[in-house]
Design a protein with these regions (language model features):
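FAD-dinucleotide binding site
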Residues: 1-380
């Protein structure tokens, strides 16, 4: 459920009852997308635009402007969750599923999940600062060449780099080249552009639990969306365990443009947006900001994967399939969110894919998780 209020650009808070009703409809549209094969829209942007037109035709004219604003806010919400502009996503059933149980906030941050994994490993099992540049596959082993000259020999390699890195580097990273089916999967699956902006204030200007501000632009105000990075922002949310911090969610071309801007411009623009949509000129400037830069980060080159117009029903399966040696043994295994056909784009997909590939090797050596730390170390 969307928490907080949707506001118009003139500072009017839209009735929460109307917002809730539209949000429920929006979730229904999501579920129904791709189910009707006749007259299939070209892409998801067209699909949701058509749905907006349909609901306006059935609604009281006095509610039209607010319905329009709520749907446009939710389109930015959907764009953030998909990973990029909705015009890049085909209007079909992609097989994506929500994991049962809903969202979970991790109070100590995601690093605590890593701690739980490597706290049980031998002290020298994890080597940091070793940027792998080349993976040289031979019949009996694999050599990993690192940036500063180090190299490692292994029987098996689990590749966990992002799809963005694979897209940019797989031809020079892997020798011999990856199988054609895997190269095609790397090309065909989309890789998104998503970022967050954290704004830290000396004193919060909002009431705790009521700080959510979602931007409801009118259709007429979005004609220049492609050239205005901030019009890709879905809204501002409170941050768990950080009572004086808001986070802005942004995706698509706006997320990429954001990375090119100076901090001061980002501070200015976010403050002006909050003042405009809250109709409150007293909203202060943040003390400082922190923002992600996933698109330009050379170790990610984007955010997370999504179905685009080239993605096929077997693309994710082809990406996750291991590369075998001549003895039919798994030599290169692939993990990461983009190798999960059902939960792609999520953190739980990334985590479960790593466990999946570890289990693949355990099964290869006929080990069980209980003795993996002892026996697998001696066999590998």
């Amino acid at each position: 459920r969307v928490q907080g209020h949707v506001y118009t650009s003139t500072g009017q808070a839209i009735d929460p009852g109307l917002t809730d009703n539209i949000f429920k409809l929006f979730l229904q549209w999501e579920d129904e997308e791709g189910s009707d094969k006749s007259g299939l829209p070209a892409n998801s942007q067209v699909y949701f635009t058509q749905k907006l037109k349909e609901i306006l035709e059935k609604s009281d004219i006095k509610d039209h402007l607010h319905i329009e604003c709520v749907v446009n806010a939710l389109i930015n919400y959907e764009q953030f969750h998909r990973g990029d502009h909705l015009s890049l996503s085909p209007s079909i059933d992609t097989g994506y599923e929500e994991i049962p149980g809903g969202n979970v906030k991790v109070p100590k941050g995601m690093i605590s999940i890593l701690h739980s994994l490597y706290d049980n490993l031998p002290a020298d099992a994890v080597r940091l600062g070793q940027e792998a540049c080349q993976v040289l596959r031979r019949d009996q082993d694999v050599e990993i060449m690192c940036k500063f000259g180090e190299s490692y020999i292994a029987d098996h390699v689990i590749v966990t780099c992002s799809l963005g890195v694979l897209k940019a580097c797989h031809m020079k990273m892997f020798q011999p080249p990856l199988p054609e089916s895997k190269q095609q999967a790397i090309k065909d699956i989309g890789f998104g552009r998503v970022n967050k902006i954290f704004l830290k204030y000396k004193v919060p200007f909002w009431v705790e639990g009521n700080g959510g501000v979602y931007l409801g632009w009118k259709n007429a105000e979005l004609s220049d969306k492609d050239s205005k990075w901030y019009k890709h922002i879905f809204g501002f949310d409170e941050v768990m365990n950080n009572p004086n911090v808001l986070v802005a969610w942004i995706s698509g071309a706006g997320a990429e443009e954001l990375e090119k801007l100076e901090d001061q411009e980002v501070k200015e623009t976010c403050t002006q947006l909050l003042r405009q949509f809250l109709k409150d000129p007293s909203v202060p400037y943040p003390q400082e900001i922190l923002r992600s830069q996933w698109v330009s980060n050379p170790h990610t080159l984007g955010s997370y994967s999504y179905w685009n117009h080239d993605t096929k029903s077997n693309s994710y399966h082809n990406l996750l399939s291991p590369v075998l040696n001549s003895a039919n043994e798994p030599q290169l295994c692939f993990a990461g969110e983009a190798t999960n056909p059902t939960y792609y784009s999520t953190m739980h997909a990334a985590r479960s894919s790593g466990l999946r590939e570890a289990e693949r090797l355990l099964q290869f050596y006929r080990l069980t998780p209980k003795n993996q730390l002892g026996e697998i170390d001696s066999k590998l």
